Structures are given as C-alpha cells and as structure tokens.
Regions:
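Short, charged/polar, Gly/Pro-enriched secondary-structure boundary elements
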Residues: 44-46, 59-60, 119-120
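Acetyl-CoA-dependent GNAT
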Residues: 53-56
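Vicinal oxygen chelate
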Residues: 15, 37, 49-50, 76, ...
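Short, structured motif recognition centered on aromatic/hydrophobic residues
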Residues: 4, 46-51, 71, 122-124
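Eukaryotic phosphotyrosine signaling hubs
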Residues: 67-73
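Long, charged/polar, surface-exposed segments that mediate recognition or autoinhibition
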Residues: 62-67, 85
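Core segments of cupin and vicinal oxygen chelate
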Residues: 1-45, 82, 105-107
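Short glycine-biased active-site loop of nucleotidyltransferases that positions the nucleotide triphosphate
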Residues: 26-30, 63-64, 113
C-alpha cells in the first residue's frame, strides 16, 4: 500500500474483505478477497483505482521486457520528478524509464514509467511546459 498511498499520493477511500464465488468469477482459490479503493476525496471525478488481493494467490508473473497485448499499464497525471522522488525515498525504483515528448505550442511533456511491487506498470504524465 505504501507504493500507492505514500508514493503516488492516493487516499484509501474504502477497504473491505468480500466473500463470494471468486473461484467461479476469477478462477481464484478462495472465496475471500480483499478490496481497497484508492482515489482523491477532494477530486472524486478523477477516478478510482481498486486493488484486489486474494489470499493464497500465485506469485505475480515476471514483468515482460516490452508491452503486452491489451491493457498493460495504469496512466496517472502527476508531477514526474516529485512522484519519482517520493517513490525512491520509499525504496521503489524498479523499472523506471523517463522521456520527454514534444507537445503543441513548443512545449514538452515529461513522462516516466515505474513498476509497482505487484508488477503493474504505472505511467506518470507531467504537465506540459
């Protein structure tokens, strides 16, 4: 949770352990899952990230060297330098890559990716300057 909360600045909006037929729905090995909803309570229209954990789940697959087919990352608008510094201070530096992309009106947009501890690739998109 430190990666998502302390590093990326999300607030835990709601957390609960749900009981259901998760083996049928997800192919899980348990009927219990832990669900945590993260977001910004001051800006609820910016979206919510749900983290789901199953007890006894298999280890995460290795992160591939390149993009996977289909959805492969979570993209967030954040100050790139500040966010990467906050994550590094917490010990999170896996998979960091940075670029700058040309934008309209002669501006540039800083971008970076970092791999979360659970293997999710997170893209950071900074403001155009």
């Amino acid at each position: 949770m430190r990666f998502w909360r302390d590093g990326l600045g999300f607030t835990e909006l709601f957390g609960h352990t749900f009981t259901g037929d998760w083996p049928e729905l997800f192919g899980a090995q348990t009927n219990e899952l832990r669900s945590v909803f993260l977001g910004d309570p001051q800006m609820p229209d910016t979206g919510i990230v749900e983290l789901v954990a199953f007890e006894g789940a298999n280890e995460a697959l290795p992160v591939p060297a390149g993009p996977r087919h289909g959805f492969f990352l979570l993209s967030l608008q954040r100050d790139v330098n500040e966010t990467l510094s906050a994550l590094a201070a917490l010990g999170f530096t896996d998979g960091v890559r940075r670029i700058t992309v040309a934008a309209p009106a002669g501006k540039t947009v800083p971008m970076a990716v970092i791999t979360a501890p659970d293997g999710v690739v997170v893209e950071l998109i900074g403001p155009a300057r």
